[in-house]
């Protein structure tokens, strides 16, 4: 039987506010346990929550960016459940009247097509604390620093049909919230976490299958692996005569499998009711208009502009616009270096390789956009060749200065003197007289392969400094003269 996969995602994004959603406590990551928890966060009797307006503003920014309906009147509700890191015994969230309603996000698939993914809603809520198991023998510690950190939970429609589509959607959300500046997107620190709802159904069937939720997956790679593992588990289970049970599962990356955590709760299990300590939030049109006018250029618009303004391919434009920092870096390089396609190649390939090797982001790059742009100018004015440019780039990355100073100090300036190149080529051909005779006796097809040998010898003799274009032109004339 052929199966169709149905995937919906819930993405929890920690909003980049300076203080928590209902208290004045700081939200700094990595502080000593329980040093950033106020009486409100601890759930002490007699204290009242006060809503952080910045969290509301950030949620509205996101809603406008995905062309969603903004709830002009939205209500906070208590989500009741027991867990050791939830001191109040309930979580303040939103249920019937969320701040962000239906919207959509377009994602680019591997074959270049665009698919629209529906967003059901996005609502504000407070994060829970954190259970600490590693540092305690036979017991669990509780760190409430995270309790009360503002979250925007983004709930998609079940519109994805493969793990790769799901990853593309998460990457699009990740890029968007970073562009907006509402979340740092640091998945390793838990700033963006994903719950994956997965089900299968016979191909052509309209009714959804029984879904399982995989909780708290925190990397793009693990999202793909967890979903694929769960898909295979469900297929094997059904084809062996079993039934999928609706439940919450965890992904074990070491075993590459999901395992049962608990039966899946429904909304009525949490006994939601409006929080009596918080008034309904009324959002005025003027507040939204101020936010709308301040929205930055978003990834889809930037991709479109990169293609039309710089003549980039759809692939290159999507890669460069995948983060706001990378897009800004690229445009600064173009502003100085002038050639957009050359800049795109260096940013994506050479700089990208360096960043991967060092394990850092582009905002920590050891080569600034100004330095790279300056080096590209030297390629364009034939001061250095593309090959020598790699040596210059490595030196800049090692902190040896800008391109001009490195070229001067290392004597890397390209040889463009026709007389000097001509003399050098005569010496190369004299040293390879036998190959010259073979070249001249060969047919056109063999000559093409042999010509590369002479070019290589010439560049070796000049230590890579000879202008490649001049070498090719003069060499061809000498060999065929």
Curated annotation (Swiss-Prot):
It catalyses: L-glutamyl-tRNA(Gln) + L-glutamine + ATP + H2O = L-glutaminyl-tRNA(Gln) + L-glutamate + ADP + phosphate + H(+); L-aspartyl-tRNA(Asn) + L-glutamine + ATP + H2O = L-asparaginyl-tRNA(Asn) + L-glutamate + ADP + phosphate + 2 H(+). Keywords: ATP-binding, Ligase, Nucleotide-binding, Protein biosynthesis. InterPro entries: Asn/Gln-tRNA_amidoTrfase_suB/E, Asn/Gln-tRNA_Trfase_suB/E_cat, Asn/Gln_amidotransferase, Asn/Gln_tRNA_amidoTrase-B-like, GatB, GatB_C_1, GatB_Yqey_C_2, Gln-tRNA_amidoTrfase_suB_CS. One of its GO terms (biological process) is translation. GO terms for molecular function: asparaginyl-tRNA synthase (glutamine-hydrolyzing) activity; ATP binding; glutaminyl-tRNA synthase (glutamine-hydrolyzing) activity. Its EC number is 6.3.5.-. Pfam families: GatB_N, GatB_Yqey. Belongs to the GatB/GatE family. GatB subfamily. Heterotrimer of A, B and C subunits. Allows the formation of correctly charged Asn-tRNA(Asn) or Gln-tRNA(Gln) through the transamidation of misacylated Asp-tRNA(Asn) or Glu-tRNA(Gln) in organisms which lack either or both of asparaginyl-tRNA or glutaminyl-tRNA synthetases. The reaction takes place in the presence of glutamine and ATP through an activated phospho-Asp-tRNA(Asn) or phospho-Glu-tRNA(Gln). This is Aspartyl/glutamyl-tRNA(Asn/Gln) amidotransferase subunit B. It comes from Pseudomonas putida (strain W619). The lineage of its organism: Bacteria, Pseudomonadati, Pseudomonadota, Gammaproteobacteria, Pseudomonadales. The gene is gatB.
